[in-house]
Swiss-Prot record:
Organism in which the protein naturally occurs: Arabidopsis thaliana
Signal peptide: 1-22
Protein name listed in UniProt: L-type lectin-domain containing receptor kinase IV.2
EC number(s) recorded for this UniProt protein: 2.7.11.1
Membrane topology: Single-pass type I membrane protein
Active site: 472
Length: 677
């Protein structure tokens, strides 16, 4: 029993000795003379024959590490407290350029023997892009940084900082020391001279002190940098101590001359007289390359910068845009010109869909969404381009109707006006009506298109928040989607006015053959002038003929409204239908009704024309069209159709008296038609 007790006591005493030895670990290197079995060298780190630990050489963008191979028990496993520690060392930095170096040196306490994934340059071999600043690093370091890195908040290119898990220092100061008169003296880290450092951590006050001084000076009374922080959350139980360094683009060498360390006590003083001397540094002689080559390179660089600036300015002008106050509310629908330029492949002629008096239209594919669009680029010679463009933006930007061509957005640059529409794959209606088209529309398709356009025009007149006068209803402005549904487009001539107010338009704008007589006289556009144009459109779709045709051979002018009206007077109105429709397979009564409705909408008296609400009722069969009956036409009454010889003063029998039940009065339309707006 006594023997067992003696063995237990001996084992306990041995453990205490080992713990005490670990808790008071210390070592001193007055130079690093090979072989160094207890120091691990990594990266560029080597030992010179005279005992200098050379962390880096003149290689660029490299790291060098030197760590003591013995693990040090920094933290008490029972209470979690970090032990006090102290270290002192002497280092020097040699640079090929006296005023510039890269990138510095750091004393490190790390959880691993080396830092294999650390980066060079501004990361000083401590961290990389992904782990910089992570709490899981468990790295304490004091950096002696010779390059200012703004991303880490460095104050300058000659500073000392305390780093905890990252390169954004917890505290820092310009490198220097306070002399015996308490006056701060700057100290250049790249002076090519030996510099001595003291780093102390007190586990009771949790104070970290970093003191710096020239090689041959005593330790200053005041530290350069201090910081209070309990390192128990930073350091693990077992850690390694050592140094890290890194190079950047400037050729630099980092030397460690001597080093001592102690746990739970003050680090032993270095024997300065025994420390190895630095290699003699001689400045390089300026070669012929620097005398001749550098000026040539500089000159080439200047020309390159000028060319680059010219290219940037030219490119900026190429995609330059304009933005005015009125565009603010439509900002979300604004396209960049660069995007439209690439979408249309530079507005190539092969992507040109059409060209008119108001502008040219190009097919394009938006790079981001791959959406097919039609980009209308307004011609430079458009006299009222800006006004028309603004009207279009305001009227279409917020509209949403299945029979209107959606306006996706717009762009403006240096006087150019661009509108971006949803692309309609089947193009405009007119190409299916004239010039022997390859594809002929049957009556069902034409009827669907007519009803769709009527619905869209009714939306503009009565269903939207403001009255919108289209002013250019015609077959070429009706676009067909993939299912041959008619969509009313080209709002470049649209005008808005509030419900109940007079339209303030004074310019005669539109297309010959679709202009109402009163529009030619007064220059004012109203919903009734749109109805007149829609009447011409109805006759156009049913007959397959243009509202006006000039025959140069006979010097005659064909007026579609006049022709259909004359056929109706003779009782042969069905002769006006398009021969391509054939004679069967569709509702002939519906065709006749549409022709008569076209005449009614083309009435010379705007009060006699139906509203678009009534037009829809007729087309949908919700209300019967009033019967048209010829009366005595010998009274000589005439109507101005706005069709021939400048569309003023065309004599034509006035059929305002041929409708059954016509009595005249303040509202002719109300006496003729039921319903209303």
């Amino acid at each position: 029993m006594f023997v067992k007790l003696k063995l237990i006591f001996f084992f306990f005493l041995l453990c205490q000795i080992m713990i005490s030895s670990s808790q008071n670990l210390n070592f001193t290197y007055n130079g690093f003379h090979p072989p160094l079995t207890d120091i691990s060298l990594q990266g560029l780190a080597t030992v010179t024959p005279n005992g200098l630990l050379k962390l880096t050489n003149t290689s660029v963008q490299k790291t060098g590490h030197a760590f003591c191979t013995e693990r040090i028990r920094f933290k008490d496993s029972q209470n979690g407290n970090v032990s006090s520690f102290s270290t002192t060392f002497v280092f020097a930095i040699h640079s090929q350029i006296p005023t510039l170096s890269g990138h510095g040196i750091a004393f490190v306490v790390a959880p691993t023997l080396g830092l294999p994934f650390a980066l060079p340059s501004q990361y000083i071999g401590l961290f990389n892009i992904s782990n910089n600043g992570n709490d899981t690093n468990h790295i304490f370091a004091v950096e002696f940084d010779t390059i200012q890195s703004s991303e880490f908040g460095d104050p300058n290119d000659n500073h000392v900082g305390i780093d905890l898990n990252g390169l954004r220092s917890a505290n820092y100061s310009t490198a220097g020391y306070r002399d015996d008169h308490d006056k701060f003296q700057n100290l250049s880290l790249i002076s090519r001279k030996r510099i001595q450092v003291w780093i102390d951590y007190d586990n009771r006050s949790h104070r970290i002190d970093v003191t710096v001084a020239p090689f041959d000076s005593d330790k200053p009374r005041k530290p350069l940098v201090s910081y209070v922080r309990d390192l128990s959350s930073i350091l693990l139980e077992d850690m390694y101590v050592g140094f890290s360094s890194a190079t950047g683009s400037v050729l630099s060498e980092h030397f460690l001359v001597g080093w001592s360390f102690r746990l739970n006590g003050e680090a032993p003083m270095l024997s300065l007289s025994k420390l190895p001397k630095l290699p003699r540094f001689e400045p390089r002689r300026i070669s012929e390359f620097y005398k001749i080559g550098m000026p040539l390179i500089s000159l080439s660089l200047i020309f390159s910068i000028i060319f680059l600036a010219f290219y940037i300015v030219r490119r900026k002008k190429k995609y330059e845009e304009e933005l005015d106050d009125w565009e603010t509310e439509f900002g979300k629908n604004r396209f960049r010109f660069k995007e439209l330029y690439h979408a249309t492949k530079g507005f190539k002629e092969k992507d040109l869909l059409g060209s008119g008096g108001f502008g040219r239209v190009y097919r394009g594919i938006l790079p981001t969404t791959k959406l097919e669009v039609a980009v209308k680029r307004v011609s430079h010679d458009s006299k009222q381009g800006m006004k028309e463009f603004v009207a279009e933006i305001v009227s279409i930007g917020r509209m949403s109707h299945r029979n209107l061509v959606p306006l996706l957005g717009y762009c403006r640059r240096r006087g150019e006006l661009l509108l971006v529409y949803d692309y309609m794959p089947n193009g405009s209606l007119d190409k299916y009506l004239y010039n022997n088209p390859e594809t002929t529309l049957d009556w069902k398709q034409r009827s669907t298109i007519i009803k769709g356009v009527a619905s869209g025009l009714f939306y503009l007149h009565e269903e939207w928040e403001q009255v919108v006068i289209h002013r250019d209803v015609k077959a070429s402005n009706v676009l067909l989607d993939a299912d041959f549904n008619g969509r009313l487009g080209d709002f470049g001539l649209a005008r808005l006015y509030d419900h109940g107010s007079d339209p303030q338009t004074t310019h005669v704008v539109g297309t010959l053959g679709y202009l109402a007589p009163e529009h030619s006289r007064t220059g004012r556009a109203t919903t009734t002038t749109d109805v007149y144009a829609f009447g011409a459109f109805l006759l156009e779709v049913v007959s397959g003929r243009r509202p006006i045709e000039f025959h140069s051979a006979s010097d005659d002018t064909f007026l579609l409204v006049e022709w259909v009206f004359s056929l109706w007077l003779r009782g042969n109105i069905m002769e006006a239908k398009d021969p391509k429709l054939g004679s069967s397979g569709y509702d002939l009564e519906e065709v006749e009704m549409v022709l008569k409705l076209g005449l009614l909408c083309s009435h010379s008296d705007p009060r006699a024309r139906p509203s678009m609400r009534q037009v829809l009722q007729y087309l949908r069969g919700d209300m019967a069209l009033p019967e048209l009956t010829p009366l005595d036409l010998s009274a000589g009454s005439v109507m101005n159709l706005g069709g021939r010889d400048g569309f003023s003063g065309i004599a034509m029998t006035d059929f305002s008296t041929v409708f059954k039940g016509f009595t005249g009065g303040s509202s002719i339309a109300d006496s003729l038609l039921s319903g209303g707006r």
